[in-house]
Structure formats: structure tokens, C-alpha cells
Design a protein with these regions (language model features):
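Hydrophobic, aromatic-enriched alpha-helical segments typical of multi-pass transmembrane helices
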Residues: 1-203
Length: 203
């Protein structure tokens, strides 16, 4: 059985992603992410934000990712009953994605915390950018999710796990394509959470 509170799961994930990018003076989007290198832009954008906000996002985000793992592991277990190979790949993909994305989410929250805590000046900006630039391998968290969904799509198309072909609508790709023009930070993660609502009706 999938996690029984999918709406709460989606809300927690979206909330944790969005409070890292929505500020009183504007919203950080993918298209202007590189502007964070400009200390004046970052300081103005995050003016008035408490350091507790990114830390709250970090802690709640990891909690949400744990719930996410439970949901996707349940989907992998269901697939394993029908096709063990596909199920094993799905489980490996979601395990890798959730473990690495937990570390990545905490790192992003800590980077913003340091910038806000130490005065939003050039030194604080340098500390933030150094931290965000470190541990580049953590960005591979999306690799696990991509592996998961490619495997799931193949399993659906081949009929190996018994889902109808229209179940492809609930995979992450259609939702990601719809959301991408919005340039929301955390689009892949949010799309993955929204897709989980669909699987509640199929399992």
C-alpha cells in the first residue's frame, strides 16, 4: 500500500521547496539562479528573512523525503511482484534518489542559513556559494529519480507490471513538461510528488 496521506506528502514537499525560493522581495527562479553570485541581488532578495526559515525547510524537507521513499518503495514492491527485475531497479533508483536528495536539500538549506545568519554581506555570500558549489556529486540525486521513471515507463509500455498504457500520464515526464515553463526551483521534485497522487488510484 502506498503512503496513505498523499495530499499531506505533496503539501509538505512543495512547502519545503518553495520557502527556499520565495522571499518578501521576489522569487528565485531557475532562470535567474545565477544572479545569486551578485551579492547585492542576493542580499536584497533575502532581506527580512529569518535564518530559521531555510533550517525549517531543511528539517521538514528530509522528513518529507522519507515519506516519499516509503511511497515509491511501495510502488517498487508492487512492481516486484509482477516483474522482479523491474521492481529491483525501481527500488534501487528510489533509494539512491532519496538518500542523496536528503543531503542535497539539507546543503541548500544550510547555505541560505549561513548567508542570512552572517549578515548577507560579501563574506556571507562567498560562504553560501562555496557551500552550494561543494559536494557536486549530490546533484546526481535526480539520476536516481530519472532511472526510476525510465524503468517505470518501460515496464508500463511492455505490460510487464500490468498497468494500462494511459498510466504513462502519471509518470513524472508529462507533469515536468507542464511545470518547466514556470521555472520553479525544485520542479523535478515537486513533479515527482504530484505524480504520486495518480498512483494512488492504480495500486
Amino acid at each position: 500500500m502506498l503512503y496513505s496521506k498523499p495530499k499531506q506528502l505533496v503539501v509538505i514537499n512543495i512547502y519545503c521547496d518553495r520557502i527556499l525560493s520565495i522571499f518578501p522581495n521576489g522569487t528565485l527562479k531557475l532562470v535567474n539562479y545565477s544572479k545569486l553570485k551578485d551579492g547585492a541581488y542576493a542580499a536584497k532578495l533575502m532581506e527580512g528573512v529569518s535564518p530559521n526559515v531555510p533550517m525549517r525547510s531543511g528539517v521538514l524537507g528530509v522528513f518529507a523525503i522519507v515519506l516519499e521513499f516509503c511511497a515509491y518503495a511501495a510502488l517498487a514492491a508492487y512492481a516486484y511482484q509482477k516483474a522482479p527485475l523491474y521492481g529491483a531497479i525501481l527500488f534501487a533508483g528510489t533509494t539512491f534518489a532519496c538518500i542523496v536528495s536528503s543531503a542535497y536539500h539539507l546543503k541548500c538549506g544550510l547555505a541560505e542559513y549561513m548567508f542570512l545568519k552572517y549578515g548577507r554581506d560579501e563574506r556571507a555570500k562567498g560562504m553560501m556559494l562555496d557551500l552550494m558549489g561543494s559536494g557536486a556529486s549530490l546533484r546526481l540525486c535526480s539520476l536516481g529519480m530519472i532511472t526510476f521513471y525510465i524503468t517505470l515507463m518501460v515496464a508500463i509500455i511492455t505490460g510487464a507490471i500490468g498497468f494500462p498504457i494511459w498510466a504513462l500520464v502519471f509518470t513524472i515526464l508529462p507533469i515536468f513538461i507542464v511545470m518547466f515553463p514556470l521555472q520553479i526551483v525544485g520542479t523535478l521534485h515537486i513533479a515527482a510528488m504530484v505524480s504520486m497522487l495518480g498512483w494512488m488510484f492504480l495500486i
